Amino acid sequence: MIVLFGGQKGGTGKSTISINVSALLASQGKDILVVDGNATQGTISNWCERRESTDLPQLTYVEKSGNLYKTLDSLRDKYDHVIVDTGGQDSKEFRTAMLAADILITPIYPNQADAETLVYLSPLIEQAQEMNGELKAYVVFSKVHSNPKVKAVEDTRKLIANLDRFHVLDSKTVTRVSYSDSIAAGASAAEMGDKKAAIEIENLVKEVFS
């Protein structure tokens, strides 16, 4: 399966979530390829390089730019899962990766500004689905406030309920220091001992990959 993390807004947790998902799948014994399609930022590649010096479950990674379709399509059957990160902008990498991907996951903050970016993303997904009928588009809420009294997720769900190109996932990630600290160590938040973060990523993987 090819799973693409992408969207039109930066800083919403695409790289962080893709890293933690990749680490969990690797820990389950899956053969994982991580494709860094946002080489100018290099978050994924740098994390993978740091991980190589640890005893943690390893994965393969490559940096690719430009048209990603042929690369992804040729690698589809060579790995259990291919995880792609194209960053937070409308780019050639993002558009061509959608043509090969089985699933697009777009993390957003639970607020109106992020919800509105989906309005502009929706026609791009429609175009991609015309050529790639297998593509499913998911939204996951990222960096959610830990206070359960804050109703931002519920409010934002209502804002995007009429965008039929997207399926909003039940799983979500909460703002946690462990997510950023673990990246610096070449690890995942779960591998650094954060049990709550581990549950969040486990729920996401079950919902998407089951």
Regions found by a protein language model. Give the residues of each.
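Beta-strand-loop-alpha "switch" segments that mediate conformational coupling across diverse proteins
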Residues: 156-187
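Inter-motif core of Ras-like GTPase G domains
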Residues: 93-112
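Hydrophobic positions on the alpha1 helix immediately C-terminal to the Walker A/P-loop
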Residues: 17
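C-terminal boundary of histidine-terminating zinc-finger modules
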Residues: 183-198
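G-domain G4 guanine-recognition motif of GTPases
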Residues: 109, 136-151, 171-181
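P-loop/Walker-type NTP enzyme "switch/lid" segment
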Residues: 2, 6-8, 12, 23-95, ...
